[in-house]
Amino acid sequence: MKRLRVGDLVQVISGKEEGKQGRITKILADEDRVVVEGLNTVTRHQRPTPRNQEGGKITKEAPIHASKVMPVDPATGKPTRVKVRVGEDGKKTRVGKSGSAIGVG
């Protein structure tokens, strides 16, 4: 998955969370899915264990298929397609349609 990285700001383009934005916290490359902070939350019932004495209902983020999210262009604030541009020094950078670099650092 060359177009998405941990820490990228993405927007969900289809499904129940459509139009919402969040940062990627985890990438599951073998399943082609990503976990986005604060989106696609599910409630799981946790049984008490020696480590977790309380148990109860736990809310956590579930993975979303990578095809349902698009990186947000920092210049426009809108979802954009990503291409990889190779600089003169051979360094690769991901850029959006506006030409601005996408990514954390």
Curated annotation (Swiss-Prot):
Pfam families in the cross-refs: KOW (PF00467), ribosomal_L24 (PF17136)
SMART domains (alphabetical): KOW
UniProt keyword terms in alphabetical order: Ribonucleoprotein, Ribosomal protein, RNA-binding, rRNA-binding
InterPro entries from the UniProt entry: KOW (IPR005824), Rib_uL2_dom2 (IPR014722), Ribosomal_uL24 (IPR003256), Ribosomal_uL24_KOW (IPR041988), Translation_prot_SH3-like_sf (IPR008991)
Parts of the chain that traverse the membrane: none
GO molecular function, one term: structural constituent of ribosome
GO biological process: translation
One CC-aspect GO term: ribosome
Subunit structure: Part of the 50S ribosomal subunit.
Recorded family membership: Belongs to the universal ribosomal protein uL24 family.
Job description of the protein: One of two assembly initiator proteins, it binds directly to the 5'-end of the 23S rRNA, where it nucleates assembly of the 50S subunit. One of the proteins that surrounds the polypeptide exit tunnel on the outside of the subunit.
Name under which the protein is recorded: Large ribosomal subunit protein uL24
